[in-house]
């Protein structure tokens, strides 16, 4: 891992936020080893508050990304418009938690697309979750996907968290997978990335920030086994592009020799064994060989 983006619940203004203060300390301590980015995740109604412009200025001062939780029923054209205008005014990229529901009537993503195109927004837009898109009727879904592509929006699908949470009802087996329609999105030219989202918290009590695990579960849930090499970019180059990290996420001539070498004979072998040994390379030098058991031992010591 050479870069990581996290979402900070921003209830207070960033300069008074314990989350932002702690993040700044960690970002400084790790700056020579990791690129850390923070998204200020706020409820969408915050755009109507008098302090929103001040919040955006503080986010920009910290090289942060403007985020918003766009849940069912919260999105209105006026709110989305204010969000985009504030982002443009302060030179902020957007990272949006949008339509995390299997309700096909959710319209947050469609409002984001329409607003981005109308404003000709110059910043980078990331749309995370987008679960409702998979439940829309095919003509409506295809039209919206075309709009996403035209607006240049990056889509981040969360196979672990969304597979765990979506269509969840007590005493009932889920019928729906909750995964955004990643195959259709990629076919339309949209940059698709996979990510872990929650790790060992109330929303997803498992995981350990392992992108191989994310890739494996995306292959299973999305039935992507036909092109594992092609979809691997959704766990490296795709996220790098969504984060604005030019040239990162790929091995190329003249680039940094950062990679992970797995003890596997092929894709099937890699996805079949959860304890595959790996060698982490940074700047062409191995940091060591780890097995899943060794990682677990180190975590328990910590």
How would you name each of these model-derived features?
Residues 1-45:
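Divalent-metal coordination cores built from histidine and acidic residues
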Residues 10-12, 40-45, 72, 100-104, ...:
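Active-site-proximal loop/turn and secondary-structure-junction residues that shape catalytic pockets
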Residues 13-19, 169-170, 205-209:
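Short glycine/threonine-rich loop-to-helix capping motif typified by GTGT followed
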Residues 18-33, 48-126, 130-154, 171-194, ...:
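Histidine/acidic residue-rich metal-binding segments in metalloenzymes
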Residues 59, 66, 97, 155, ...:
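Conserved, mostly hydrophobic/aromatic
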Residues 93, 114-125, 165, 176-262:
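His/Asp/Glu-enriched, well-ordered alpha-helical/loop segment
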Residues 154, 161-163, 167-168:
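Active-site clefts of carbohydrate-active enzymes
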Residues 241, 253-302:
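C-terminal cap of metal-dependent C-N hydrolases
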């Amino acid at each position: 891992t050479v870069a990581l983006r996290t979402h900070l619940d921003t209830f207070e203004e960033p300069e008074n936020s314990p989350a932002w203060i702690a993040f700044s300390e960690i970002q400084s301590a790790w700056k020579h080893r990791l690129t850390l980015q923070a998204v200020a995740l706020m409820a969408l109604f915050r755009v109507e508050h008098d302090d929103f412009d001040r919040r955006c200025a503080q986010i920009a001062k910290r090289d942060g990304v403007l985020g918003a939780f766009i849940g069912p029923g919260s999105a209105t054209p006026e709110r989305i418009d204010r969000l985009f205008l504030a982002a443009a005014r302060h030179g902020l990229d957007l990272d949006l938690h949008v339509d995390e529901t299997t309700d096909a009537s959710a319209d947050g993503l469609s409002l984001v697309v329409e607003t981005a195109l109308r404003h000709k927004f110059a910043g980078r837009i990331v749309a995370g979750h987008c679960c409702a898109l998979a439940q829309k009727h095919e003509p409506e879904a295809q039209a919206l996907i075309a709009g996403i592509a035209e607006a240049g929006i990056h889509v981040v699908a969360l196979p672990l968290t969304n597979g765990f949470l979506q269509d969840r009802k007590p005493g009932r087996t889920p019928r729906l997978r909750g995964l955004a329609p990643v195959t259709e999105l990629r076919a339309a030219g949209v940059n698709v990335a996979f990510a872990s989202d929650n790790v060992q918290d109330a929303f997803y009590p498992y995981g350990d920030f392992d992108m191989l695990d994310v890739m494996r579960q995306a292959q299973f849930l999305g039935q992507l086994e036909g092109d594992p090499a092609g979809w691997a970019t959704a766990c490296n180059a795709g996220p790098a592009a969504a984060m604005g990290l030019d040239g990162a996420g790929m091995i190329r001539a003249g680039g940094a020799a950062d990679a992970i070498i797995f003890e596997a004979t092929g894709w099937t072998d890699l996805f079949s064994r959860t304890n595959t040994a790996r060698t982490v390379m940074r700047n062409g030098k191995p940091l060591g060989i780890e097995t899943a058991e060794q990682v677990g031992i180190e975590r328990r010591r910590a």
